[in-house]
């Protein structure tokens, strides 16, 4: 996402980029990464000062955060929208974002192709449930970008038998009560 944004800004194909994600933690990670690899003015929706919005070239927002302020922007304000975690039910809940802005739209997901919603493929113009690009787990392992995984199953007495008050110490009971459990 960052490399594509930088490439398109440097080539003057886009002036402003909107990067959307589904959680504040991802918004923070994205802001740090964009700051590390680009020198473009950045605006983090819900975090940056409103005065910083005017000069920003890259905007980072959660889906709900952008929904709250999207009507402050003209439909042509962004030239590129990158939607992280685009496999989630974004079309049903946040589809208006993608319908409102007249911009090139890129959807990113790590979800296997057969688990992505048909409406998500349609939203990004990928008919027939065929993504524009796909990098499978198997390919990533073969290219040494990921290591093979092994599923390890563990269990605990609590998972097998449940929590029984009579087996807990007074300190454990107090701790659970303080946690609202």
Language-model features and meaning:
Residues 13-15, 40-41, 77-78, 101-104, ...:
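Short glycine-/polar-rich loops that comprise or flank the Walker A/P-loop
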